[in-house]
């Protein structure tokens, strides 16, 4: 589960986006950018202090999320097209930093994604559980959480009800950017270096987890318990394929087929609900 923690953190953010009817394909690239920039800033010749590394990482993630949100809400571009574009831009920016080839020697960052409690429970598991509990409480007991479900269920009615739809959608992308930043720091902690390809393909894994966990692709439905269970299921399947030495290409086929299957089930469920009404 420790190796799958990055996807759990990313799922925390994209679920919030999807509940409000949004979509974010740039999560892997944002985490990769945060990771490689943070790793470069920790190099001996630069030596940025650890607390400032966290501030810079979170600022990068939230800023990119803010840009995504503003483009989607203020310009009106489809979220898939918007985040696909930012995915390419950010991934190219990652390769700009590639010639630095930074290694991670910062002891705190090394332990951030590797340490265990009593040599049994990974810190990363605790992070995910804490994130999920906090977000679940926000969704259940705050006006912001209720507004997310309302916007995802029917954006037009939400606007008529006076809910600040655009502002809330922008906030969801900023939240997603925050979790991308945490995921990027976990990546370089676990892998020991900063590489431009880190985070590539994370979108496939995370979307599969979130949709399998019961989050509707169109928004307005989902909870963190379902996503947590889906994370355990997908993590077990992935680790099982690694232990069985399943070829890499076949693992990708299985993951892609699983994503198509869960989205198809979601679409059929929505169609059936429409027929009932």
Predicted regions and their residues:
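Single transmembrane alpha-helix segments in multi-pass membrane proteins
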Residues: 1-46, 70-77, 210-224, 257
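Membrane-interface helix caps of multi-pass small-molecule transporters
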Residues: 16, 40, 45, 66-75, ...
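Transmembrane alpha-helical segments in multi-pass inner-membrane proteins
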Residues: 180, 190-256
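Transmembrane helix-bundle core of multi-pass membrane transporters
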Residues: 75, 79-144, 168-171, 190-199, ...
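Cytosolic-side transmembrane-helix boundaries in multi-pass membrane proteins
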Residues: 159-167, 241-277
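Hydrophobic alpha-helical transmembrane segments
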Residues: 7-8, 29-33, 51-59, 81, ...
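Hydrophobic core segments of alpha-helical transmembrane domains in multi-pass membrane transport
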Residues: 13-15, 58-61, 87-92, 127-138, ...
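Helix-loop-helix "hairpin" substructures at the membrane interface of multi-pass membrane proteins
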Residues: 49-57, 63-68, 118-194
């Amino acid at each position: 589960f420790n190796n799958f923690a990055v996807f759990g953190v990313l799922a925390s953010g994209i679920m919030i986006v999807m509940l409000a009817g949004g979509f974010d394909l740039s999560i892997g690239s944002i985490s990769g950018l945060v990771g490689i920039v943070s790793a470069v800033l920790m190099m001996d010749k630069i030596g940025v202090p650890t607390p400032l590394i966290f501030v810079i990482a979170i600022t990068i993630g939230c800023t990119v999320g803010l840009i995504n949100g503003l483009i989607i809400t203020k310009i009106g571009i489809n979220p898939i097209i918007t985040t696909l574009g930012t995915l390419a831009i950010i991934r190219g920016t990652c390769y700009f930093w590639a010639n630095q080839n930074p290694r991670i020697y910062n002891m705190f960052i090394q332990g951030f994604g590797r340490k265990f409690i009593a040599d049994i429970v990974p810190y990363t598991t605790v992070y995910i559980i804490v994130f999920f509990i906090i977000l679940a409480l926000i969704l259940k007991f705050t006006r912001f959480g209720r507004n997310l479900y309302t916007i995802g269920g029917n954006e037009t009615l939400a606007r008529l009800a006076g809910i600040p739809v655009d502002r809330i959608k922008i906030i969801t992308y900023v939240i997603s950017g925050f979790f991308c930043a945490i995921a990027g720091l976990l990546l370089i902690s676990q892998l020991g270096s900063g590489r431009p390809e880190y985070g590539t393909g994370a979108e496939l894994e995370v979307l599969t987890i979130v949709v399998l966990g019961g989050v509707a692709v169109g928004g307005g439905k989902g909870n963190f318990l379902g996503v947590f269970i889906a994370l355990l299921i997908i993590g077990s399947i992935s680790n099982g394929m690694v232990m069985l030495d399943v070829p890499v290409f076949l693992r990708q086929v299985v993951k892609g087929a699983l994503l198509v299957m869960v989205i198809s089930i979601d679409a059929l469920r929505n169609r059936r609900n429409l027929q009932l009404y």
